[in-house]
Amino acid sequence: MTLRLSAIDLRHSNGTLALRGLDLSIERGERVAIIGPSGAGKTTLLNLLASALPPSAGQLEVLGVNPWQLSSRQRQQLRSRIALIHQAPPLPARQRVVTAVSAGKLGQWGLGKSLLNLLHPLDVPGARAVLARLDLADKLFERCQQLSGGQLQRVGIARALYQAPELLLADEPVSAMDPRLADHTLALLCQHAIEHNVTLVASLHAVELALAHFPRIIGVRDGRIHFDLPAGEVERQHLDTLYANEQLSPQQVCEVAETVWAPRC
């Protein structure tokens, strides 16, 4: 079991209850997409799973342990086994791409090796290889400020893949990419998860991409799990109620539910 949540609540410091009574189990090697309207709690849920935020109530198990019963050092060691791909990767503007990708290993290296890597990248071939999978090998020595939003997202993905985590979390990882590139990139993430038996959990606004690439779909609304279904069982009525009052036309929902349902990986 990779993830287990039981009666989880999470309240932000401003008093907002972002997650309410979540019960969820995800097995090792599963590929799960989280969908739902803006403000539903998708990003908060991923941060909870990454052990970046503690629950306010309930029981949480990540990779076999409760992160918040560990010491700070033990929790940091746990986080080195987890990668979180951000929608807007926090990459320093003047940092070179090779250094940004190599940073995926910082949690696994000692202080001395980490500092040395900042001065002189220690594994240029490894960084180049993972960037090549994302068609970015030619950007190896460019600065992050020279890249487009979609390219920065792919650098963030490359860093996560270079880290080689057991649990891969992705928060809107392809939102800045054109449809074709987004499709290709999600296929690559899924294939990586299959080949390495990695648990992959991704939040996506593009319902059609979620249904096309992920065998299991979790719909989240108002901090609650609205449905948890195999992709092939997600129907129009599920999406209608999930996105009620949102900017998703009935025609779009119908097309998604009827034509895009079989996972590709």
From Swiss-Prot:
Pfam families: ABC_tran. It is an enzyme of class 7 (translocase). Its EC number is 7.3.2.2. Keywords: ATP-binding, Cell inner membrane, Cell membrane, Membrane, Nucleotide-binding, Phosphonate transport, Translocase, Transport. It is found in: Cell inner membrane. Its main location: membrane. GO terms for cellular component: plasma membrane. It catalyses: phosphonate(out) + ATP + H2O = phosphonate(in) + ADP + phosphate + H(+). The complex is composed of two ATP-binding proteins (PhnC), two transmembrane proteins (PhnE) and a solute-binding protein (PhnD). This is Phosphonates import ATP-binding protein PhnC 1.
